Amino acid sequence: VVETGQTPAARSIGIPLGVAQITARLERLPYSSWHVRARVIVGVATFFDAFDALAIAYVLPALIGPWHLTPQRIGLLISVGYVGQLVGAIGFGWLAERIGRLRTTVLTIATYAALSFLCALSWDYTSLFVFRTLQGLGLGGEVPVAAAYINEWAKAKGRGRFVLLYELIFPVGLVAAALLGFWIVPTFGWRYMFLIGALPAVLALVLRWLLPESPRWLAAKGRLEEADRILSQVESIVSRGGKVALPPVQAMPAVAAAEARTCWGDLFRGIYLSRTLAVWVIWFASYFTTYGMTTWLPTLYRTIFKFPLPQALKYSLLINVAGLAGTAACALLIDWTGRRTWFAMAFAGGGLSLGGLWYVGASDPRTVLLYASVSFFFISSISLAVYLYTPEIYPTRMRALGSSVASAWLRVASAIGPSVVGFTVGSYGLANVFLVFGLIALVGGVIAGLFGTETKGRVLEEVSP
């Protein structure tokens, strides 16, 4: 059956217009400057998501004295942002299955940018507490929905590198927050960190005119002619108006368009039960460790080791640079090692490093810097790679929902982690903080190694029917 609304490109393929045809055309597209452009545009939003998420870590040391902050209030202020992110991740993930990946991404950017501006206007602890909580809604929703969007444009071969080179912008945003925090907070004041975080409001205004909706999502919703039209436009760009021949279309598994809306229970049916539970553990273990360390280390250097503010921020910057190096290595190697193997090895490397720091005592700031940097090199790569892996293990009909609900465990871990640090430091000493982190990381490695699903080199519709 040939539908009258389909484009000439679709009619020339010889496969009836349907989900399988859209998938086959996406899989035959070579990575091109168009894909890089899409990755960069979405990456700008993700860069500022990371920047805004970590900005609080570099603002807090400047507020300890003026606002008379106790360790308990610091931990609560850090944690409450992640509570907002938890709600935002689930809510915006649900919305992305209803109204689309791109429209939802625009809403998340507008939310976190506007609230960053309000954070800059905070006049006391309570106002910053409220604004930071609300900002978390947008911060929690943007990355998993954007990751689903980028995944749905990627073909099986080289998908790990393609997606992770986009995701790499997140740790770059973390490093940028550290660099700018090191310079801006002592020089201009803490409010400017939040003002910088409001800049992507401009992107929210123009994003829908810069990029199209995901054809995979449109096809899964039965909007085949829209998916065909968008894909034909991209094919024309990639082929330079037909001057460059595209590879032939290969047959793909037949996948029906979704006949009913996805419900939460679908995440726990059939093969997706074990996948969901395993990936939740991976998210929790990686972010409990990484966010617990990155948000608290500037303050720990300031309060326990009595560093002046610039030196405390400098040491924290070095750890983030180590994390950036680890994520870059992951982006280059994960299509070779596979997802499951990388997760197991990185959790083991990070967990053993943290256990070593507990063993030697964590009494010297340079020792803390060394061991924490090695650990961060490994575990921060997992924090990045789960944004690649999670969309791969769910079908299009629930890809954004599954990714967003899984990322909610990031928010749970990030909310609990800083509070655990504050409690453990006060009650049991600094060294035991790293013991807790190390044990959590090792548990994550065992679960990933035993129950992870290998997805490298496989078409999304094959991995998740």
Where do the language-model regions lie?
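Transmembrane-helix signature of 12-pass secondary carriers
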Residues: 1-465
